[in-house]
Amino acid sequence: MRNDYRIWLYSMLKKLLKFSFILSFPLILSACGGGGGGGSSGEAVGGGNIPTCSDNTDYTTAEYNFMGGGNSAGTGAGKYGLGTVCAGAAYGRGATGNGIDIAVLDSGISISGGSTDINDIDTRIASFQSGADIIDSDNVPEDDEGHGSHVAGIIANEKNGTGLHGVAYEADLHIIRVLNESGSSEGNSVASGLDKARGISGIDIANMSLGDSGVIGTTCNSAATCETSLGSTLYTALENFGNADVIAVWAAGNEGSSSPSVISGAALYDDDFKETTVIVVGVGGDGLLSTTGYTSDKCGVAATICIAAPSGGNGEYLYSNYSSNAQSTYGVNSYARGANGTSMAAPMVSGGLALIKQEFSSLTNAQVVDRLFATATDSGEYSKSTIYGHGLMNLAAATAAVGDLQAIGGSNNLDGNGVTYYNLADNNFTSSAAFSNALTNALAGQTMEVYDSFDRANFETNVSSFFTSGSYTSQNTIENHMLRLRPKTTKKTKNKNLYGSFTVETDGNYIESSMFNSAGGFLALGYNQSTNSFENAVDPLSNFFNDSNFGNNYLVNPYFNSGSGQDYFMSFRGNSSLGFDSFTNANGNDLGLAFNLNPLSSSEDGMKNAGDLEIVFGANYEQNKFLNSTSSGVFATGDLSNTNFTGVKYKKNLSNDITFVGSGYAGYTYIDKASNSYISGSTPLLTSSFTLGLAKANFIKEDQRVGFFINQPQRVEDGSLNLKVPTSSNSDRIVTYNNLNVDLEPDSRQINFDIIFNKTITETSNLSANLTHVKNGDHAKESNSQNFLSIFYKKTF
């Protein structure tokens, strides 16, 4: 068995013509002021086989294109390389490789000026964390051959605006020299290098652009035969490496074989390290398996753990660093050389895995590998799995959501028992107009995690994106004014037309005014189909347009604004009544109760000069909502939130023609928590509303009436909501939640100004007009003022 595991030099040292081209390259670099490459002048790249990327153009710079041989203007052949795997799309999503540790087992790294200090290593590489030289038994892995420097640069060359950058240009590298100046291992240097890498804390990925002349599936076709072929020392090191949960990336080999080399493919027969092993074959400038310049091995029997990536070949090269000991330099502390072979394809994938790993902290290393495979381009030419395995690496797809994005509920473990996932469209919260934009304003800039349905990869989104500000605007449109002007279902009781919810009219002086004839005293029990539901039970004449004769306009107080339902209102005695409402609407189920007491209505005539006073006590119970907000999914509220409220209504006849009216309501809302909801609690919410106004009869003529009113719709005056949202997750699949306490008081106060005019035309018909001005609509400071004019003619038959 041979233990001389040769690196794949990909014809670099054999092609003197190409070497001469590189020597002349400094002249081009100097003229362009940075960047460069050589070895191929072809402009057409891909030959129709490489898929088109929607890369973020902010990142497709000359530095981006350099690796693929592009010129300093960022055009031409440079579209090969990073552009082939759609790296720009991943960069646009924030992936850089930052914080990901990658071990490079190779021939070492170029050292500046022959230094023996690891900190002086060529600064083109973004970040060095450690180094080891297995060959010379020290900690300075100086590259005497050049191959390792080239590989390291493809993975993590720094992005600094000049020259070229690597795939994961902010990754941390750990350089372990396991190959000598001839590009061969010595003794058990590869096994020792694997053990060394495994012992480095935090290593996520290891790149091995090295191989042997054997072919997987022949002499190595089972765990036992692979161990025999490789030797027990190396095979044990491979097993231990896999058990350490480090992703191992291997070059397939450059022999043109039907399957990869033995050392890269041994994992196929051993589950201990199969799930974290990736074998890489190379595609050339035309997107096809490289057969010119070098001939890549095929995926063959190892297709399930194999993928394709750019490697140079078929008329193209990949450019990267090269050791000063083996290659002429250009620029300060920079080295560049074109090369081809699966040794170049492997670091492309190692860098790609680093981007995926950084982007999705919730994934285990095995899941990172699964995602790499699942998102590869596998259509057309790349559907040939015996050649390309899972297909061509696609970093745009790998860093995007796979399947539906979902919110987690019910657990802090992504795979835990009882965990529930909700599609994003099923999670929303529309605020009540009572607290308007308070939630969206407070949550601006706050982020939370959501997860895709493929492997629960974590994505960041704005919490506020699930929230919509509540609005009274729908009540202020002309169309809705017309709806409000529409008479309610009518019934007759003692020859009295009843509009809106039924009420008790035991005292004409209280209910009616001098503006029209009193109906006299009577008792009534009735039913009505209402469009403004419980507010009518609380305050039967809830807006200016519900009454047929305008006389009760002063009773308006928009404390509740609910959906349609059934209202009941019943009298117990001359000065008290009970309202009851039960309904279902789009926002959930409500049950409301109200008790009205008029302490002055049955008083002596002399007391009535003090005016008419009504005191209201009540409660409103809401199912799956509060204050008429709507919510679902992880923002749902519980089955029974309740509001306890009280109100005072007062009327005083200032003269035979002029009446003062006023009312005010206040209440506390207690929010019920739902299971799996991010709404984890709240303080009691204090709300209020008020109405003040003057009504004048005999305006100009006896058949004309006018009213001037000012009112404030229901508004939260004090109270807060606590949200507990997921903000991070780790590879142990544990989710961390963060508490957000949100003040629900809106940033302004809506005030409505109304002028109402009514003219009696005949005993059965009248004409009404209403002019409304709305200031700070929806209690929002940024709202524009609104004006509405409504005209309504009504005839009773």
Q: Model-flagged regions — what are they?
A:
Residues 106-109, 267-354, 358:
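Extracellular S/T/G-rich loop segment that most often corresponds to the catalytic His/Ser-adjacent loop
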Residues 536-538, 543-562, 566-571, 578-585, ...:
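Outer membrane beta-barrel transmembrane domains
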Residues 33-45, 54, 59, 96-97, ...:
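Substrate-binding/access-modulating region of protease and related hydrolase catalytic domains
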Residues 784-797:
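Outer-membrane beta-barrel "beta-signal"
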Residues 152-155, 174-179, 202-204, 312-388:
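Hydrolase catalytic cores
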Residues 51-56, 60-61, 86-132, 137-187, ...:
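Subtilisin-like serine protease catalytic core
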Residues 462-654, 665:
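Outer membrane beta-barrel translocator domains of Type V secretion systems
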Residues 79, 86, 204-209, 276-279, ...:
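C-terminal subdomain of the subtilisin-like protease fold in secreted/lumenal serine endopeptidases
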